[in-house]
Amino acid sequence: MGGYILAIDQGTTSTRAIVFDGKQQVAGVGQKEFKQYFPKSGWVEHDPEEIWETVLFTARQAIEKAGISATDIAAIGITNQRETVVVWDRATGKPIHNAIVWQDRRTASFCDKLKKQGLEKTFSKKTGLLLDPYFSGTKLNWLLTNVKGAPARAAKGELCFGTVDTFLIWRLTGGKSFVTDATNASRTLIYNIVDNSWDDELTDILRIPRVMLPEVKDCAADFGVTDASLFGAAIPILGVAGDQQAATIGQACFKPGMLKSTYGTGCFALLNTGKDIVRSKNRLLTTIAYRLNGETTYALEGSIFVAGAAVQWLRDGLKVIKAAPDTGTLAESADPTQDVYLVPAFTGLGAPHWDPDARGAIYGMTRNTGPAEFARAALESVCYQTRDLLDAMHRDWRSNGKDTVLRVDGGMVASDWTMQRLSDLLDAPVDRPVILETTALGVAWLAGSRAGVWPKQEEFAKSWARDRRFEPKMDGTTRKGKLKGWRSAVKRTLMAA
């Protein structure tokens, strides 16, 4: 057995598998996209079988590209899109319905009904979350309500519920392990983050039988061993974390006050609050950053539904760019005298507004507005939303923000223009790491440290390396004016919802 770690990064639009060597360097990568299903407006689904196929394909591809065999791999780490719900037959392992994705809004009216019953405070106090369709609990309730025979089968213990990690572990271990980790559990709306356990009151409200829920483990733990037939040898699964928590670990944000922001399909900012459960007064989420050796570290999280998705809209919807990397160059050529604002509420607005009914809008267009201005507005919308999140975090964390340094990762951070504009609008330094695969790196560290082949936490944190720091260059008057325009645009969008 070698010091290699296989990290499986199961995302919203594609699955990536990365083999890291003993020096925490990328040795091999596999990636495969899969189909998105939109049965109705606001509904988003995945086929769990297609996800499973991409996991096998990319893992084998990464191992092959690394030039190693399964016997060289010390452990597997799994990180995944959070909140997405899978329900499958315990006997056959077959899903009873497509996975309902975190972006799916079909349970909005049910969430409103629960709010009118005065239950949001109950959920928030126990889970740190808001009553929103984003989270797993109401999605699971929908499946149990709408799939014929599901309630009775679930009550008999015939059905299993899991976030994507749980489903993959079940499949990888041949149905021998029915487990999840604390970070994924904390996103379900039925896990008590104070007691660190499934909550009977919440499962009763949502009519979810406890028997269908997985065992919850630390992020670095024994999650089972893969079936030897899958990769040519049995490999222990020793690390699991939701994608944003894994990125927090990969960015070595281990100290209270450190924060990172990941820019993928959406944008997710996490602020480490240590052992303190900080209750947000600004509609941020209180969540579990990670749990190691039985000790829970908490975080404040701000979730933005549309980040990279805005660039995809430019490419696939407006067709003003041919490829995502073109966006920064196009934005740079925009007319500086035009103040065009895109509020990308394609599926509602996330933190700190949490309005599922808001819809996208563009303000400030003139006859001279063209592709360059649209590109700039799309990229700036991500920066503005990040500013909103960080302002809310500073208020909750009682920080003046002067010492803020934001560590960034995800596909969008490769754009120098976007990162410079982010620093300008935040009025804070933005650090881009050498290794951009921070989500995979974080879960690889969980697995590698558990296996004893990767360094301990303190040494791992010291090894974090910066590629470039972006410092604010925009003058205060310009920044103030742009932020005022953005807030006006958001206000008008919310009023129209």
Swiss-Prot record:
<dbReference type="InterPro" id="IPR018484">
    <property type="entry name" value="FGGY_N"/>
</dbReference>
<feature type="binding site">
    <location>
        <position position="14"/>
    </location>
    <ligand>
        <name>ATP</name>
    </ligand>
</feature>
<keyword id="KW-0067">ATP-binding</keyword>
<feature type="binding site">
    <location>
        <position position="12"/>
    </location>
    <ligand>
        <name>ATP</name>
    </ligand>
</feature>
<feature type="binding site">
    <location>
        <position position="265"/>
    </location>
    <ligand>
        <name>ADP</name>
    </ligand>
</feature>
<feature type="binding site">
    <location>
        <position position="12"/>
    </location>
    <ligand>
        <name>ADP</name>
    </ligand>
</feature>
<dbReference type="GO" id="GO:0004370">
    <property type="term" value="F:glycerol kinase activity"/>
</dbReference>
<feature type="binding site">
    <location>
        <position position="411"/>
    </location>
    <ligand>
        <name>ADP</name>
    </ligand>
</feature>
<dbReference type="GO" id="GO:0019563">
    <property type="term" value="P:glycerol catabolic process"/>
</dbReference>
<dbReference type="InterPro" id="IPR000577">
    <property type="entry name" value="Carb_kinase_FGGY"/>
</dbReference>
<feature type="binding site">
    <location>
        <position position="12"/>
    </location>
    <ligand>
        <name>sn-glycerol 3-phosphate</name>
    </ligand>
</feature>
<keyword id="KW-0547">Nucleotide-binding</keyword>
<feature type="binding site">
    <location>
        <position position="312"/>
    </location>
    <ligand>
        <name>ATP</name>
    </ligand>
</feature>
<keyword id="KW-0319">Glycerol metabolism</keyword>
<feature type="binding site">
    <location>
        <position position="13"/>
    </location>
    <ligand>
        <name>ATP</name>
    </ligand>
</feature>
<dbReference type="GO" id="GO:0005829">
    <property type="term" value="C:cytosol"/>
</dbReference>
<feature type="binding site">
    <location>
        <position position="83"/>
    </location>
    <ligand>
        <name>glycerol</name>
    </ligand>
</feature>
<feature type="binding site">
    <location>
        <position position="83"/>
    </location>
    <ligand>
        <name>sn-glycerol 3-phosphate</name>
    </ligand>
</feature>
<dbReference type="Pfam" id="PF00370">
    <property type="entry name" value="FGGY_N"/>
</dbReference>
<comment type="function">
    <text>Key enzyme in the regulation of glycerol uptake and metabolism. Catalyzes the phosphorylation of glycerol to yield sn-glycerol 3-phosphate.</text>
</comment>
<feature type="binding site">
    <location>
        <position position="265"/>
    </location>
    <ligand>
        <name>ATP</name>
    </ligand>
</feature>
<feature type="binding site">
    <location>
        <position position="308"/>
    </location>
    <ligand>
        <name>ATP</name>
    </ligand>
</feature>
<comment type="similarity">
    <text>Belongs to the FGGY kinase family.</text>
</comment>
<dbReference type="GO" id="GO:0005524">
    <property type="term" value="F:ATP binding"/>
</dbReference>
<feature type="binding site">
    <location>
        <position position="134"/>
    </location>
    <ligand>
        <name>glycerol</name>
    </ligand>
</feature>
<dbReference type="GO" id="GO:0006071">
    <property type="term" value="P:glycerol metabolic process"/>
</dbReference>
<feature type="binding site">
    <location>
        <position position="243"/>
    </location>
    <ligand>
        <name>sn-glycerol 3-phosphate</name>
    </ligand>
</feature>
<dbReference type="InterPro" id="IPR005999">
    <property type="entry name" value="Glycerol_kin"/>
</dbReference>
<feature type="binding site">
    <location>
        <position position="244"/>
    </location>
    <ligand>
        <name>glycerol</name>
    </ligand>
</feature>
<feature type="binding site">
    <location>
        <position position="411"/>
    </location>
    <ligand>
        <name>ATP</name>
    </ligand>
</feature>
<dbReference type="InterPro" id="IPR018485">
    <property type="entry name" value="FGGY_C"/>
</dbReference>
<dbReference type="GO" id="GO:0006072">
    <property type="term" value="P:glycerol-3-phosphate metabolic process"/>
</dbReference>
<protein>
    <recommendedName>
        <fullName>Glycerol kinase</fullName>
        <ecNumber>2.7.1.30</ecNumber>
    </recommendedName>
</protein>
<feature type="binding site">
    <location>
        <position position="134"/>
    </location>
    <ligand>
        <name>sn-glycerol 3-phosphate</name>
    </ligand>
</feature>
<dbReference type="InterPro" id="IPR043129">
    <property type="entry name" value="ATPase_NBD"/>
</dbReference>
<feature type="binding site">
    <location>
        <position position="243"/>
    </location>
    <ligand>
        <name>glycerol</name>
    </ligand>
</feature>
<feature type="binding site">
    <location>
        <position position="16"/>
    </location>
    <ligand>
        <name>ADP</name>
    </ligand>
</feature>
<dbReference type="Pfam" id="PF02782">
    <property type="entry name" value="FGGY_C"/>
</dbReference>
<dbReference type="InterPro" id="IPR018483">
    <property type="entry name" value="Carb_kinase_FGGY_CS"/>
</dbReference>
<keyword id="KW-0808">Transferase</keyword>
<comment type="pathway">
    <text>Polyol metabolism; glycerol degradation via glycerol kinase pathway; sn-glycerol 3-phosphate from glycerol: step 1/1.</text>
</comment>
<feature type="binding site">
    <location>
        <position position="308"/>
    </location>
    <ligand>
        <name>ADP</name>
    </ligand>
</feature>
